[in-house]
């Protein structure tokens, strides 16, 4: 497996020490414009990007960037620049979760789909208890000119690879390995014992088409079978964690594209766009491996970092406002992180 500690420290060594903070060994906060800061990150070194950029449509003056653009197109152009950098720094088997408003959802997806396969659009509902449901109960319904936006969106995506939604980095690699050692999909299926119910290529053809992924045990069988035929040592086989996009859910998690998490209740020093830890943990647990590197390019008060630490991941947080950088540092220094893995 890739030496994540080495990769993590190598990434951090590229940042100016005057703007880099390490409140914990596996949590780093970098102050500055994340669009510029990302240029210092080596290509294909981040496992998961979980981030909450300005929504633009909400037009809140207390959120940096929310009132920056007068035209929608200018905001979308700006976000497209982020998408280009996200794709460059993300591992081939990495994933992204990007928060957005329901009003800008489709326009953003149109831009993101140039570089990413859109795997899901998650609707985050907010089943808050009475008294903690914001303006939903208090507002005058007769003044509404559209349906009240009681939910938010999270676009879940992975780097585009090929011309089809299901094409994957692993599928393309498996096909190229087979061609190098001259073994058919049918023969490899027989050797691994992974028979398909429909097509004659069995599971191998499904894996190459991106309709399914092998288990860890199946991947080991694939590699062993290919190594026997790779007599000239032409192929360098990556570990499972470095080629298979993680997606790990179970019955204890929210596993549909509707997520029900209460919002963060008001407290002194709360970030105006703060997201709940349990929601962030749901995404991190599903789409990363233990010890992976999680990046948040709009980190606010450091919630993503706290969630990542609780699950045994490393985090890099980027924040442009000094006020929130200091709040994040204080938060991560003082918070007793309880590992949940």
Which residues does each predicted region cover?
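Charged C-terminal helix
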Residues: 324, 340-341
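Core catalytic lobe of class I
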Residues: 1-10, 14-318, 323-325
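Conserved phosphoryl-transfer catalytic core
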Residues: 76, 333-339
């Amino acid at each position: 497996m890739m030496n994540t500690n080495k990769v993590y420290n190598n990434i951090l060594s590229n940042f100016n020490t005057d703007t880099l903070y390490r409140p914990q060994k596996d949590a780093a906060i970098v102050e500055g414009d994340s669009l510029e800061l990302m240029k210092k990150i080596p290509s294909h070194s981040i496992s998961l990007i979980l981030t909450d950029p300005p929504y633009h449509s909400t037009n809140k003056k207390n959120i940096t960037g929310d009132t920056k653009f007068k035209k929608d197109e200018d905001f979308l152009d700006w976000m497209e620049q982020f998408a280009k950098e996200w794709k460059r720094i993300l591992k081939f088997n990495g994933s992204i979760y990007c928060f957005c408003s329901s009003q800008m959802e489709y326009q953003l997806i149109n831009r993101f789909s140039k570089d990413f396969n859109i795997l899901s659009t998650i609707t985050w509902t907010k089943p808050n208890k009475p008294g903690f449901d914001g303006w939903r109960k208090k507002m005058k319904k007769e003044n509404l000119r559209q349906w009240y936006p009681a939910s938010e969106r999270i676009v879940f995506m992975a780097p585009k690879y090929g011309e089809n939604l299901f094409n994957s980095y692993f599928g393309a690699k498996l096909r190229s390995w087979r061609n190098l050692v001259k073994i058919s999909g049918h023969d490899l299926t027989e050797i691994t014992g992974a028979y398909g119910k429909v097509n004659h290529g069995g599971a191998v053809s499904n894996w190459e088409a991106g309709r399914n992924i092998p288990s860890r045990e199946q991947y080991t069988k694939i590699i062993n079978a290919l190594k026997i035929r790779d007599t000239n040592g032409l192929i360098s086989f990556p570990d499972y964690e470095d080629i298979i996009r993680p997606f790990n859910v179970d019955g204890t998690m929210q596993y549909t594209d509707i997520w029900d998490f209460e919002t963060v209740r008001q407290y002194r020093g709360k970030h105006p766009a703060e997201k709940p830890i349990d929601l962030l943990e749901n995404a991190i647990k599903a789409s990363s491996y233990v010890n992976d590197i999680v990046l948040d390019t709009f980190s606010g008060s450091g919630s993503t970092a706290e969630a990542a630490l609780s699950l045994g991941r490393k985090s890099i947080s980027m924040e442009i406002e000094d006020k929130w950088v200091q709040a994040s540092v204080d938060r991560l220094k003082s918070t007793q992180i309880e590992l949940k893995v």
